Amino acid sequence: MFVYCLNNPICRIDLYGNVSEEAAKEKIEENKEEIIAAGKEFNVDPAIIAACIYVEQVLNVNWMDSLSDLLCYSFDTSIGIGQVRVSTAILVEDNGYMEQSQGFYANQLYISREEVVATTLADDKANIRYVAAYLAYWQDRWSDTLDISNMPEILGTLYNLGDNANEPNTSPKSNGFGRHVGVAYGMMKMLLYKRVGNRGVQYEIN
């Protein structure tokens, strides 16, 4: 069951909490320039970045998340468009993929590194860069064993499992999340490179 969100008949929310596929697609289209730029920056296929974000939105995000993300800085919660955990962002920083966040004092109140990271992750553009950086981390970690840069199902699985993932091997298996990423991959490529012109919808797929 869906209802309009913010009196907008296009933006709908599921009363049971799930983000609609339409809303998730719109999120990708709204941020496609940032997704493509992050892919170039971290040498990750932008369509895989988009597919991970899309599947997170459809499977793991509900309307309560947007209310709770910024209230949970003291916990290792998943935040933002790509549902990046605070600990994951710190891992990415500590491995040199992103500049390290620093805690600081503000009016004698200490703002922890975790709080700084959580605030950063609430910004879509920054969050997308962390998604891309984390996927780059997994590509590099596996590079000596298997090139997974063109395997959306496996990168999606690793993105989802994190520390619970198997060690690099030559016969990786995808989980449910990874298979959803694989299914979404082609659609994300079309969304990212769709261009509307005088000749109608065209695609500029690199």
Residue ranges of each PLM-predicted region?
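Polar low-complexity intrinsically disordered regions
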Residues: 13, 205-206
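Catalytic glycan-binding domains that act on GlcNAc-containing polysaccharides
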Residues: 20-204
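Short turn/helix-capping motifs enriched in Asx and small/polar residues
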Residues: 1-21
